[in-house]
């Protein structure tokens, strides 16, 4: 099953990450788990940059699903250019999407993925409304 990245989305961060030798598998290309790590790294960098840091005694984002579509292989050496987008802001959830391309071929998407994020009140272990300050960042 392939999940398509929506046309309507907001670019929130573009980052260049090194493809490490250890990211590859026995077949000589980047292992599929590494693509999820690239998406996670950029998603966390963006959340930290907007002041959304872990608050175990408060509230914050939790990933409830994640996916990745693979189109072309990434290989060492090189850098991966990850573009992170947000969309579909609801009361307690929003979507993040990422495209991954070689930095030396930024218009050739090698993989694209996403994650559904739910805002959680951690002490209660229940979904709660996305706070206004975060909603403004997501929708601006």
Residue positions per predicted region:
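HotDog/MaoC-like acyl-thioester-processing domains
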Residues: 1-15, 70, 74-76, 86-140
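Hot-dog-fold acyl-thioester-processing enzymes
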Residues: 2-65, 121-140
């Amino acid at each position: 099953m392939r999940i398509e990245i929506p046309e309507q989305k907001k670019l929130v961060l573009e980052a260049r990450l090194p493809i490490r030798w250890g990211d590859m598998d026995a077949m000589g290309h980047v292992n599929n788990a590494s693509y999820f790590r690239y998406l996670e790294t950029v998603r966390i960098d963006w959340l930290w940059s907007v002041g959304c840091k872990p608050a175990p005694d408060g509230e914050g984002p939790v990933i409830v699903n994640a996916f990745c579509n693979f189109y072309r292989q990434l290989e060492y050496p090189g850098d991966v250019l990850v573009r992170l987008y947000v969309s579909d802001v609801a009361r307690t959830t929003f979507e993040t999407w990422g495209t991954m391309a070689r930095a030396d071929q930024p218009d050739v998407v090698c993989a694209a993925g996403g994650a559904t994020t739910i805002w959680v009140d951690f002490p209660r272990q229940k979904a709660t409304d996305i706070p206004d300050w975060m909603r403004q960042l997501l929708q601006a």
